[in-house]
């Protein structure tokens, strides 16, 4: 899948670069202490895309501007909550873990054990870059009652 230049630009502004691999040991410990199983796809995502603040400016047809704030800063996403507050098991047959929050912390972002990403409202991408491209470009989400897989 080809990723848009806008998505690459927004990710780079947030501190991402190709081959990025940050130390996630404190975040893994933080998550495990709260009852989360931190599987390999989540670790891989956090190493490359963790601890980013992605602020995307949108210009409306009337010329006004709005900023969509997205974060992959795990402690900001989880806060004082534990794993019992984050689940998609009613919607998919795959383990998930929260790895971000979208639209000013209004919607959680999850990664599954199979590397697919989901918003709390539905599927958003089959891999991290596809999901981030869909989020940054505000492409549609496949809502739960239509999701298969």
Please identify what each model-predicted range represents.
Residues 125-149:
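Compact, glycine/acidic-enriched structural inserts
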Residues 105-110, 122-132:
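Short, surface-exposed beta-strand/loop "edge" segments at domain boundaries and coil↔beta transitions
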Residues 117-120:
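Short hydrophobic/aromatic-rich beta-strand segments that constitute the beta-sheet cores
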Residues 111-115:
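Short acidic-glycine loop/turn motifs at beta-strand connectors
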């Amino acid at each position: 899948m080809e990723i848009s230049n806008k998505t690459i630009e927004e990710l780079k502004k947030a501190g991402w670069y190709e081959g990025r691999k940050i130390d996630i040991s404190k975040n893994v410990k933080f998550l495990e202490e709260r009852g989360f199983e931190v599987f390999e796809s989540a670790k891989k995502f956090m190493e490359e895309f963790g601890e980013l603040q992605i602020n995307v400016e949108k210009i409306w047809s009337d010329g006004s501007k709005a900023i969509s704030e997205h974060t992959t800063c795990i402690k900001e996403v989880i806060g004082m909550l534990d794993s019992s507050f984050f689940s998609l098991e009613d919607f998919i047959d795959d383990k998930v873990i929260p790895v971000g929050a979208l639209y000013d912390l209004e919607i959680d972002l999850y990664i599954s054990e199979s590397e697919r990403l989901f918003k709390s409202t539905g599927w958003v991408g089959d891999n991290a870059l596809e999901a981030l491209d869909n989020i940054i470009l505000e492409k549609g989400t496949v809502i739960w009652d239509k999701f298969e897989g």
